[in-house]
């Protein structure tokens, strides 16, 4: 356990760090792996589990007694969208929370400065770099923004402007107070209420938009789109038939035909016969069904049959060749080897022959069965624990290296984060039977044991404290309870499927119906319990990885003599924003799957607005939600922020160790000013005067380059301020 604690906490691993090759190379590798694992935790485990547990339809079995109504799905869709947006930004949120929660009374000012710098850096990258990249990509396509889309994006821009004004006030006051955090949390909550209400009132789509979405689902996206980025865990893959507008119902990562299956299917189609079935081929197939004869007569009969067929005779006409055989030339029909001749002494040679026969037969079939079982087991292991290696031969060198490196981490995540599928239980109305999928059930039994014990182990590593043996009684009891629950579930399914000869009276049918309802409720309860355990475990994993990154940044800050503010504005912000950049760019490229011009324009507009709205939502979540929630929890419940004052008077200064007292941190102010300028530019593009909008729309590529250059200039100014301060 000590080695795991040292690896997870760089301050313990690098006790005397210096700028040397022996420190820089492993530390940079440490940072890259931590960022990649954060993306894997969020996209592969946390997001799918939250999407599954928040959708009642996905918790029901196939053939459930409760119908999956569309109205219920639309009612929960908005809540699911909010939860999934929170999950996609979970690395930023948890790194923000950990920088506050792990502070001491001496380091709280620098830790909060790192948090504010990371948030402002992430907001600037998302609004300037990501939005600018979107504008550059969409500059080649004509877009038509509707009035509802314009009002929606204008509302989000105004909320983002208000959020940046609050951040500017905090930077000018050079402190964060409890009242500031309350205001931020209230502003984000009000944003959610307005957004959900507005979405519900204007969620109806035109028939043209619906037709375009249907056409998009029919025209599948290539399964190899951005495969190199998906393998690193930074990008949730864009799958075939991935409908963005309805992605919540299908989960974050809809299943797709793997590369191996796709290539096998393609080769099967290429190798199939493209010729028309002529008479000779059909006659040859008919002849193979007849009794075998010696080779010379068989070839003669096939020739005669072919000539008769070519003359226009029907295929069913018997050929003369079969009447030419003499008895001596008939095919020999021998009995099987087990039908041995009669012997007076059965213990004589019969036993020896039988043993030889059984040994040969059993040896052949046993080896074949073992090969088949090993191949099937290998397929199960790849499918369950290392699915990102299924198309390993088609990965680039860098992706293959990262895929191999992350294999042990992915296996540990899989063992600690149960993900029961929605189709674990299905009902066949014709047979009145339930069927269980074997592989997920086996995996749930394994995770029933591993997940509780890994939970205690992760907590021990995160707290850098060896838990007592009595603490491990809790995971032991929990594991036994989960195993008993699964066993009872399987037993009830088998009892329901048991054949009975009872009469189907009304009372018996009603009793069967009640048992079905209880069985389906048990299925739903099992899914919720395992999903909740998975969410708790993966949140602790994300907290551990985020804390490791923060400790690594603190080491570099001490070695280089840099402030935590500039580290948060640059390295930390870029590391947590790469995933947003890649996913939004890939989303914009989806319009290329449509060939019809009008559908192409409509889909391009739709994905453009989705990308812009997701960027603004990320800004609101990181700034108001992240700082507001983290600051409020820390200043109310963590002793390092308690200066024996009333709770509403508590505050923390944004003070670096190299700064004088009450000196403003101009890097924060510069960042806020440039972000506000970017928001004003977006307001002019979407809601400015018509002549300005037309000019900006024509020069979208130039506008996108200007947006990227805006944040590049802000970063340059911040670096100069850091160097000369």
Swiss-Prot record:
Domain of life: Eukaryota
Major location category of this protein: membrane
GO CC aspect terms: endoplasmic reticulum; membrane
Statement: the UniProt record of this protein carries the keyword rRNA-binding: no
UniProt keyword list: Membrane, Transmembrane, Transmembrane helix, Transport
Disulfide linkage: none
Keyword flag Membrane: yes
Listed transmembrane segments: 21-41, 119-139, 157-177, 178-198, 397-417, 439-459, 470-490, 526-546, 559-579, 621-641, 668-688, 704-724
Topological category with respect to the lipid bilayer: Multi-pass membrane protein
Compartments, record wording: Membrane
Example GO molecular function: monoatomic cation transmembrane transporter activity
An annotated GO BP: monoatomic cation transport
Similarity annotation: Belongs to the Ca(2+):cation antiporter (CaCA) (TC 2.A.19) family.
Protein's recorded name: Protein ECM27
Provenance organism: Saccharomyces cerevisiae (strain ATCC 204508 / S288c)
The gene coding this protein: ECM27
């Amino acid at each position: 356990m000590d080695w795991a604690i040292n690896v997870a906490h760089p301050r313990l691993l690098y006790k005397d760090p210096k700028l040397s090759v022996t420190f820089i190379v492993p530390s940079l590798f440490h940072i890259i792996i931590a960022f990649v694992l954060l993306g894997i935790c969020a996209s592969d485990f946390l997001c799918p589990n939250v999407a599954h547990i928040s959708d009642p339809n996905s918790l029901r079995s196939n053939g459930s007694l409760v119908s999956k109504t569309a109205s219920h799905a639309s009612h929960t869709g908005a809540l699911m969208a909010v939860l999934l947006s929170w999950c996609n930004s979970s690395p930023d949120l948890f790194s923000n929370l950990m920088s506050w929660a792990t502070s001491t009374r001496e380091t709280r000012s620098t830790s909060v400065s790192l948090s504010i710098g990371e948030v402002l850096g992430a907001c600037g990258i998302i609004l300037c770099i990501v939005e600018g990249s979107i504008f550059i990509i969409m500059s080649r396509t004509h877009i038509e923004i509707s009035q509802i889309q314009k009002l929606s994006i204008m509302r989000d821009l105004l909320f983002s402007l208000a959020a940046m004004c609050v951040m500017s006030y905090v930077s000018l006051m050079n402190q964060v107070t409890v009242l500031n955090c309350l205001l931020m949390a209230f502003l984000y909550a009000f944003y959610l209420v307005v957004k959900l209400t507005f979405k519900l009132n204007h969620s109806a789509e035109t028939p043209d938009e619906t037709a375009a979405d249907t056409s998009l689902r029919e025209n599948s996206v290539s399964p190899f789109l951005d495969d190199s980025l998906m393998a690193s865990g930074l990008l949730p893959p864009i799958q075939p038939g991935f409908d963005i507008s309805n992605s919540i119902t299908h989960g974050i990562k809809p299943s797709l035909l793997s590369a191996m299956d796709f290539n096998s299917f393609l080769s099967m189609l290429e190798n199939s016969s493209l010729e028309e079935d002529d008479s000779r081929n059909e006659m040859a197939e008919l002849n193979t069904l007849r009794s075998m004869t010696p080779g010379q007569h068989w070839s003669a009969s096939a020739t005669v049959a072919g000539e008769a067929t070519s003359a226009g005779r029907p295929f069913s006409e018997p050929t003369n060749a079969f009447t030419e055989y003499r008895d001596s030339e008939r095919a020999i029909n021998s009995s099987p080897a087990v039908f041995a001749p009669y012997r007076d002494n059965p213990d004589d040679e019969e036993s020896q022959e039988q043993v030889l026969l059984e040994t040969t037969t059993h040896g052949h079939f046993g080896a074949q069965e073992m090969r088949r079982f090993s191949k099937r087991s290998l397929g199960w292991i790849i499918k369950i624990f290392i699915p990102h290696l299924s198309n390993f031969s088609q990965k680039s060198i860098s992706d293959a290296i990262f895929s191999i490196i992350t294999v042990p981490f992915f296996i540990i995540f899989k063992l600690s984060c149960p993900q029961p599928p929605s189709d674990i239980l299905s009902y066949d109305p014709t047979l009145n039977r339930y069927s269980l999928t074997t592989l997920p059930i086996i995996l749930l039994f394994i995770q029933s044991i591993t997940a509780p014990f890994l939970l205690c182990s992760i907590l021990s590593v995160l707290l850098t404290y060896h838990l007592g043996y009595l603490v491990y009684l809790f995971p032991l009891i929990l594991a036994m309870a989960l195993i008993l629950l699964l066993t009872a579930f399987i037993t009830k399914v088998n009892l329901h499927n048991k054949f009975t000869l009872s009469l189907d009276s009304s009372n018996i049918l009603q009793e069967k119906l009640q048992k079905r309802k209880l069985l389906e409720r048990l299925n739903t309860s099992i899914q919720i319990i395992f999903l909740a355990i998975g969410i708790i475990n993966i949140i602790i994993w994300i907290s551990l990885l985020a804390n490791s990154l923060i400790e690594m940044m603190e080491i570099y800050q001490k070695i280089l003599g840099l402030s935590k503010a500039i580290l948060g504005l640059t390295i930390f912000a870029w590391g947590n924003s790469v995933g947003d950049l890649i996913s939004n760019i890939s989303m914009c490229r989806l319009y290329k799957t449509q060939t019809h011009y009008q559908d192409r324009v409509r889909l391009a507009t739709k994905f453009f607005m989705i990308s812009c709205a997701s960027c603004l939502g990320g800004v609101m979540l990181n700034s108001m939600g992240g700082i507001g929630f983290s600051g409020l929890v820390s200043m109310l419940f963590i002793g390092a922020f308690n200066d024996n004052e009333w709770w509403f008077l508590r505050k923390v200064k944004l003070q670096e160790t190299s700064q004088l007292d009450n000196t403003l941190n101009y890097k924060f102010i510069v960042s806020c000013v440039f972000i506000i300028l970017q928001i004003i530019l977006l307001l002019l593009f979407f809601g400015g005067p018509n002549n300005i909008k037309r000019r900006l729309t024509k020069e979208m590529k130039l506008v996108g380059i200007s947006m990227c250059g805006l944040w590049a200039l802000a970063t340059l100014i911040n670096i100069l301020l850091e160097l000369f301060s």
